[in-house]
């Protein structure tokens, strides 16, 4: 959340600090005849280099606990929260390379980059619950993913997380599908009071230190999170979907956009317009109306017809869409809702198996922009 003055100091710091190690290396060469001076200069050089690294990394300091600045009385529905689509793919996949990866950071690193909403899609393999993306199994189990998030909540109790759940049933047989409600319910029960109770007008104070589960599929023992109804993948989304409290059946209106396959020029235009439209809806939504807006998608086709979820396709989508969305994010403080994206927390990624040039995806800038749109805390 840099002011112009902070940005100026940052530039001055780079200008001043970067040449200093070079200067000291030159002076060091003049001191070779004196053992004491040489040792002293080496020590000074090491300190300066460490200071430079610390200075640069300090620009992201605070993102691991950015919610500390949000007033307790603010409604969760009125926040701007960066999210990671298929968040566990950054942990690695048990599959052929080149397919299905939507993140380059693991879950812990996503948290540290400012992400607070995690799209996790458990599926049963034999009798165990792993996170999947379609038919592709990640290297992390559902319980392990929750453990990583809960560890961050222990470390940063001012924060909370939102976990968006969906059964990724493509890889499951009938027997495995029958186990899903029980295994998901059991994993959530194991985190105890860290699971937040949903209400349409819940405040930040109600959520701090907890995980809010919003699920597209019911599971056993649902008492704290909420069930989503009316989800679709059309270019228009659904501005009248519902979030239904598991505790008492209270219903909140949900505005949701998840148009995930912009595989030609017409569909790409539809995608960017849909994202911007739901950003506008979020900015005007009254308290208690929730917004989930997916920037994610893939843009690769096979022989011009069948869409394929290649890793390069997700990168390509992020590279063209994220700059357009950033241009449309007006300056000022206004709600954006929960904004799910690919390659959150990083600005540049390698091209991968299907594309040799790197992609500029602006995921770090996008996360920061979403966070910075939150209102200034009350005095």
What residue ranges belong to the model's regions?
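Positively charged N-terminal leader segments that act as targeting/secretion signals
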Residues: 1-12
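Cysteine-centered motifs
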Residues: 11, 31-35
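Bacterial N-terminal signal peptides
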Residues: 46-53
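Long, acidic (Asp/Glu-rich), low-complexity accessory segments flanking structured domains
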Residues: 59-113, 126-156, 160, 295-379
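Hydrophobic faces of well-ordered beta-strands that scaffold small-molecule active sites
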Residues: 118-120, 161, 213
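Conserved, mostly hydrophobic/aromatic
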Residues: 121, 163, 339
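Surface-exposed substrate-engagement region within the catalytic domains
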Residues: 194-333
């Amino acid at each position: 959340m840099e002011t112009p003055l902070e940005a100026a100091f940052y530039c001055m710091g780079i200008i001043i600090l970067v040449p200093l190690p070079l200067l000291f290396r030159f002076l060091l060469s003049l001191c070779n005849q004196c053992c004491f001076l040489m040792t002293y200069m080496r020590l000074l050089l090491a300190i300066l280099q460490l200071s430079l690294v610390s200075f640069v990394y300090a620009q992201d300091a605070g993102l691991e606990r950015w919610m500390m600045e949000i007033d307790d009385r603010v409604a969760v529905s009125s926040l701007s929260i960066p999210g990671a689509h298929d968040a566990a793919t950054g942990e690695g996949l048990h599959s052929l390379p080149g397919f299905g990866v939507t993140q380059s950071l693991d879950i812990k690193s996503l948290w540290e980059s400012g992400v607070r909403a995690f799209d996790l899609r458990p599926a049963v393999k034999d009798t165990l619950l792993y996170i999947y993306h379609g038919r592709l199994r990640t290297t992390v189990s559902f319980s392990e993913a929750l453990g990583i998030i809960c560890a961050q909540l222990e470390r940063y109790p001012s924060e909370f997380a939102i976990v968006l759940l969906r059964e990724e049933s493509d890889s499951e047989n009938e027997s495995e599908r029958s186990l899903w409600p029980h295994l998901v319910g059991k994993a959530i029960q194991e985190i105890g009071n860290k699971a937040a109770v949903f209400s349409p007008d819940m405040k930040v104070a109600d959520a701090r230190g907890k995980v809010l589960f919003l699920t597209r599929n019911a599971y056993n023992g649902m008492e704290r999170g909420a069930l989503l109804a009316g989800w679709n993948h059309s270019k228009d989304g659904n501005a009248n979907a519902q979030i239904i409290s598991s505790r008492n059946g209270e219903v909140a209106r949900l505005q949701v956009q998840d148009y995930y396959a912009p595989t030609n020029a017409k569909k790409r235009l539809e995608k960017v317009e849909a994202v911007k439209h739901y950003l506008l809806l979020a900015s005007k939504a009254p308290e208690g109306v929730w917004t989930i807006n997916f920037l994610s998608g893939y843009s690769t086709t096979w022989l011009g017809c069948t869409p394929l979820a290649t890793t390069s396709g997700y990168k390509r989508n992020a590279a063209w869409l994220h700059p357009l969305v950033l241009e449309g994010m007006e300056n000022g403080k206004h709600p954006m809702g929960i904004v799910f994206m690919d390659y959150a927390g990083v600005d540049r990624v390698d091209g991968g198996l299907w594309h040799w040039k790197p992609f500029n995806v602006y995921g770090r800038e996008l996360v920061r922009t979403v966070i910075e749109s939150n209102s200034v805390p009350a005095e």
